[in-house]
Amino acid sequence: MSLKINEISVKGYEKVIHAINETTKLDCIISVHNTKLGPALGGVRSWSYNSFDEQKTDALRLSEAMTLKNSICRINFGGGKAVINIRGKNKTPELYQSYAEVVETLKGDYLTAGDVNTFKEDLMECS
């Protein structure tokens, strides 16, 4: 199997993982900022990042923002976010199926949705 998942320790975040699948070209970071109110809820952004650091910074910033948004809305969800680096890659069903495999490894701690450049049709590939 070509899926590789590495956990990244970041102070103030419950879990941050970086997942690579060489076969499907997946390069994603999922950041779970906080699950005190419930599982982390946040979208997956498909974006062209120039570097790993830029991608990670975006995931961290956005997942913390989702914690605040979900809390302000008084819903029972924490905050999380996923970002997929699509620089030089095609968005394919296999890419999003591979992303779904990564989400499943979090065992319900992160719930995904659409976000910038990730559409319903892309997420239909995850089911």
Residue spans for each PLM region:
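N-terminal ligand-binding/catalytic initiation module
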Residues: 1-127
